[in-house]
């Protein structure tokens, strides 16, 4: 299996139709050579639903564009761009696009071959705006998440980490201003970088890749890279890696 980096365009042909109007594109998985990591996008047309299901691993869900409702055992959370929610192993959840516009999600699993079991929706709906210690899921709002500086002009915040209850994956969003460059040291595990908004030039050794919204690049373990924002507008990238 080829272990080189791999670029996937956000407008590539869908790999799977998970439900009517829901298209899945795999950025990396066991079938593409990734170890312990699957990252993909889900494009949801208005009015579409991913029915209730569970996974034998946790799942990290973040919003690249649009608005969706994520239901976790009946608890309904409305997520917008750069919001994220972690759903632990075995917890039933569903996603609906109740808006009038297409939504694009970014999903991550700590396995090369995620499985799911679909369930009946027998849950009473409770609208919530946040999570707390009484529920197993963990919601991160992009607007209010705690930021930390990677360089004076570059900030990031976590979606999935030990503090959010994530198991086997870690990552979040990094905001890179115009003309700035983020050096990313080599990791001992595989990772994936996806553009939420803006344009990026990613350099790995002597290779350069130009990415725009919803494009993604698989980065194998042991490879360092840098992300440059070549434009005069902001760049948001979601970086997720497997844990050791």
Question: How should each PLM-predicted stretch be described?
Answer:
Residues 1-36, 116-168:
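A short, N-terminal "cap"/entry segment at the start of jelly-roll beta-barrel domains
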Residues 74-89, 206-222:
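Short acidic-glycine-tyrosine-enriched beta hairpin
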Residues 60, 67-69, 76, 92, ...:
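Structural motif
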Residues 96-99, 227-230:
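Asparagine-centered strand-capping/turn motif at beta-strand->loop junctions
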Residues 21-28, 40-55, 153-160, 170-187:
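Conserved short histidine dyad/triad with adjacent acidic residue
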Residues 50, 85, 95, 156-159, ...:
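Fold-core signature of tandem repeat domains
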Residues 86, 100-118, 218, 232-244:
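A short hydrophobic beta-strand segment most commonly corresponding to one strand
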Residues 41-45, 54-70, 108-110, 173-176, ...:
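Short, conserved beta-strand element in jelly-roll/cupin
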């Amino acid at each position: 299996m080829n272990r080189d980096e791999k670029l996937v365009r956000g407008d590539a042909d869908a790999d799977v139709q998970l439900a009517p109007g829901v298209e899945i594109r795999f950025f990396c998985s066991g079938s593409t050579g990734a170890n312990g990591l699957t990252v993909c996008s889900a494009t949801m047309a208005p009015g579409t639903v991913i029915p209730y299901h569970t996974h034998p691993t946790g799942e990290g869900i973040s919003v690249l564009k649009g608005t969706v409702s994520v239901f976790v055992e009946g608890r309904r959370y409305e997520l917008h761009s750069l919001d994220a929610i972690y759903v632990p192993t075995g917890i039933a959840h569903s996603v609906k696009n109740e808006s009038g516009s297409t939504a694009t999600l970014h999903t991550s699993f700590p396995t090369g071959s995620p499985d799911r079991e679909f369930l009946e929706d027998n849950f009473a709906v409770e609208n919530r705006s946040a999570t707390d210690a009484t529920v197993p899921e963990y919601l991160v709002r992009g607007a209010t998440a705690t930021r930390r500086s990677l360089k004076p002009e570059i900030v990031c915040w976590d979606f999935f980490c030990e503090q959010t209850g994530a198991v086997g994956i870690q990552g979040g969003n990094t905001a890179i201003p115009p003309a700035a460059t983020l050096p990313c040291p080599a990791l001992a595990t595989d990772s994936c970088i996806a553009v939420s908004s803006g344009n990026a030039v990613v350099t790995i050794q002597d290779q350069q890749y130009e990415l725009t919204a919803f494009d993604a690049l698989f980065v194998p373990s042991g490879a360092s890279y840098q992300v440059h924002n070549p434009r005069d507008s902001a760049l948001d990238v979601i970086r997720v890696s497997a844990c050791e």
